[in-house]
């Protein structure tokens, strides 16, 4: 008597995904088999790993394999594995009621035009079964539970019931009820083609139940019976009478007996045929492996639908022995920088036995995009995660993996087109490496690429920059900001560019962290053009003019400092401005304006740190600008002129904005601007305003307090 089934509803996102898979036309449906074989391989990995510390786990079935059984009569394709199996709660949770983190991300990618073959990268590969099947049953037996069956025709729900039919021992059996228009997936040749294409490097035997013919020798009357049937048919078809020769009966009987011994018939039978007999690719000589084989192995390893960008195959021998195969993918995974997610990019083997695929100590976090395998001869087979953390062998392997990755990236830099593809995807990883890896900082700095004031639309390396430096240039000049357009038009680069010096544009938030650790490159100090103390090479006449300007504007600087009070640390004459009247620079050791903006955007920022790390501001004025010169004349004429005070505040707030800072009271600043506009248009302050005007003016501080001062305002161009 069949057990009563429990019915469950699919979680909303999963139901939506299944609907998308079923109702959308996809040309490459064959990937369903790759995904199910990959899942089976993962289940086998898990039971093998558990058995290393507890061999009794394999008492329920010693042999580890994957088996494919096509049945044309029933219209089903069955995939069996002897892996870890699933408990009842695993079936309910993993196959329907709990959405994986990648479910939503995959749907969004699909709707944006991504390929269905990406499904495995998002952890929802099982549902690809519905590309070719209208009903799926999953029978599973875990060592810790009874045998259960999961079943669904994808109508928004699924059932789970206890299963008392043929026992599996341990593992999972998936039966796909193939759609009528997809029966080619029941053909042996098609299945072999797909396995060879996608799964030939799976580490367990993949067996296909094939139908064959063989000749069978018979010594009984079976062959005669078949022949008699055939002869009777022929007799009925002809009118000629049969003539018997009685005298020859004895001879005929003797001949018949001899003939019976030799007669053979053809019979059909089934047997398992192993489809993936290739030995692990990393154990072979790199000279004997084609790029196509590397490509197929990479896809099999990672579930990626695209080829890899670069590969490094090497072995280390001596006191320590291991082989490794490292790949750089073409694009970043959707969850590259999710801190809580455990990476499974580098698979660790010990003497060809899979140990684990999420060993965090195998490669540093900034290289977590690398994929591949490491096969050690020296680690113990039953090593635990805790033991790994203390293991000296692993530390040596890690050091070698980082070194070889650096070599691989360096080789990639020689191919400009491919390196651009790599850098577009993984530049943040390299920059994170500069921040975190002091041992490889200099090497990683070689890999960085930036726009500069001389590079146009192309990126260039710091080495290119240094090679173009002028004879009298001591430093590498850089500016950080939000975009190339913003920094290239910044007041800070005016004088540097006018002198013919190149400026590096750093426009990613992570660049701010890079320059905290990258203080110099090839002996040249990196100098920010937005911070105090900028020194530019100058001749005697320029030095003399600067000293004269300093003396000439000394009184204005003091006045501006007294007006601005603690808003700025000091006011000085600038040597970096050409077209702008003034700018705000920060102290050497505080944050730049860009870093301050980034930190203010942090949701969990430390307000105490904000207080002392926000750099002390310094106002620099341009002695050659007409606004500053006119302001000096007005201040010399009357230090107590209220218009001068308002103009100084207005200049300060405007330079804050143009230097990349934000205003504490933007509304007050806006009101000052509106008053200036009114004065410029000749609108009398005493003229009655409309309600809207009154609201917009708000509590704006007056620019001037009497009409006499108003006339002073109008004099400033």
Curated annotation (Swiss-Prot):
Modified residue annotations for Phosphoserine: 219
Disruption phenotype: RNAi-mediated knockdown is lethal at third instar larva stage and shows decreased levels of sicily, ND-42, and ND-30.
Highest classification ranks of the organism: Eukaryota, Metazoa, Ecdysozoa, Arthropoda, Hexapoda
One Gene Ontology CC term in the entry: centrosome
UniProt protein name: Heat shock protein 83
Gene Ontology MF, one: TPR domain binding
Comment block on domains: The TPR repeat-binding motif mediates interaction with TPR repeat-containing proteins.
Basic and acidic residues composition-biased segments: 225-245
Gene: Hsp83
């Amino acid at each position: 008597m069949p057990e009563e089934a429990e019915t469950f509803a699919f979680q909303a996102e999963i139901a939506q995904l299944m609907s998308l898979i079923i109702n959308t036309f996809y040309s490459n449906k064959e990937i369903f088999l790759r995904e199910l074989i990959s899942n089976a391989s993962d289940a086998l990995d898990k039971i093998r790993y558990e058995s290393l510390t507890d061999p009794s786990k394999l008492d329920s079935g010693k042999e580890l394999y994957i088996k494919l059984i096509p049945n044309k009569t029933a219209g089903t394709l069955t995939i069996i594995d002897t892996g870890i199996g699933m408990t009842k709660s695993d079936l309910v949770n993993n196959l329907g009621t709990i959405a994986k983190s990648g479910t939503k991300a995959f749907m969004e990618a699909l709707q944006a035009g991504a390929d269905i073959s990406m499904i495995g990268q998002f952890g929802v590969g099982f549902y690809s079964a519905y590309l070719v099947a209208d009903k799926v049953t999953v029978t599973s037996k875990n060592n810790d539970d009874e045998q259960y069956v999961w079943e669904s025709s994808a109508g928004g729900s699924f059932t789970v019931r206890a299963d008392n039919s043929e026992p599996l021992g341990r593992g999972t059996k998936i039966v796909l009820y193939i759609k009528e228009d997809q029966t080619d997936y029941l053909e042996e040749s098609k299945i072999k083609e797909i396995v060879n294409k996608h799964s030939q490097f799976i580490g367990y035997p993949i067996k296909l139940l094939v139908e064959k013919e063989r000749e069978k020798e018979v010594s009984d009357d079976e062959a005669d019976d078949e022949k008699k049937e055939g002869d009777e048919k022929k007799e009925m078809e002809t009118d000629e009478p049969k003539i018997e020769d009685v005298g020859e009966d004895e001879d005929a009987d003797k001949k018949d007996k001899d003939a019976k011994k030799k007669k053979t018939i053809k019979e059909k039978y089934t047997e398992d045929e192993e489809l993936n007999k290739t030995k692990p690719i990393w154990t072979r000589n790199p000279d004997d492996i084609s790029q196509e084989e590397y490509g197929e192995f990479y896809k099999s390893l990672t579930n990626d639908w695209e080829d890899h960008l670069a590969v490094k195959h090497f072995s280390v021998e001596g006191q320590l022995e291991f082989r490794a195969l490292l790949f750089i993918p073409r694009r970043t995974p959707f969850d590259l920088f999710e801190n809580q997610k455990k990476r499974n990019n580098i698979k660790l083997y010990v003497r060809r036995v899979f140990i684990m695929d999420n060993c965090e100590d195998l490669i540093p976090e900034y290289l977590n995009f690398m994929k591949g395998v490491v096969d050690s001869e020296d680690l113990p087979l039953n090593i635990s995660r805790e033991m790994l953390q203390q293991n000296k062998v692993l530390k040596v392997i890690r050091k070698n993996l980082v070194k070889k990755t650096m070599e691989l990236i360096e080789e990639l830099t020689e191919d400009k087109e491919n390196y651009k593809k790599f850098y577009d995807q993984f530049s943040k990883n390299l920059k994170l490496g500069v921040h975190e890896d002091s041992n490889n900082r200099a090497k990683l700095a070689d890999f960085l690429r930036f726009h500069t004031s001389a590079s146009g639309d192309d990126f260039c390396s710091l080495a290119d920059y240094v090679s173009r430096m002028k004879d009298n240039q001591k430093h590498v000049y850089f500016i950080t900001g939000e975009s190339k357009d913003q920094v290239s038009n910044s007041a800070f680069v005016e004088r540097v560019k006018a002198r013919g010096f190149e400026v590096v544009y750093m426009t990613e938030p992570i660049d701010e962290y890079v320059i905290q650790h990258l203080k110099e490159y090839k002996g040249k100090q990196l100098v920010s053009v937005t911070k105090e103390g900028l020194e530019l090479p100058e001749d005697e006449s320029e030095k003399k003019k600067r000293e004269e300007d300093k003396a000439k504007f000394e009184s204005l600087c003091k006045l501006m400092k007294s007006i601005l009070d603690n808003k700025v640390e000091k006011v000085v004459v600038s040597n970096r401005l050409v077209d702008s009247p003034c700018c705000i620079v920060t102290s050497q050791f505080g944050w730049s304006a860009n870093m301050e903006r980034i930190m203010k955007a942090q949701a969990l920022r430390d307000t105490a740190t904000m207080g002392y790390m926000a750099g002390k501001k310094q106002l620099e004025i341009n002695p050659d600008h007409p606004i500053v010169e006119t302001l000096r004349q007005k201040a010399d004429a009357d230090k107590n002129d209220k218009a001068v005070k308002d103009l100084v505040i207005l200049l300060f707030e405007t330079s804050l904005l143009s230097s990349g800072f934000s205003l504490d009271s933007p509304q007050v600043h806006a009101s000052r601007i509106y008053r200036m506009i009114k004065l410029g248009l000749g609108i009398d302050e005493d003229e009655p305003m409309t309600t809207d005007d009154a609201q917009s003016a708000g509590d704006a501080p007056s620019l001037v307090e009497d009409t006499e001062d108003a006339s002073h305002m109008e004099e400033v161009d």
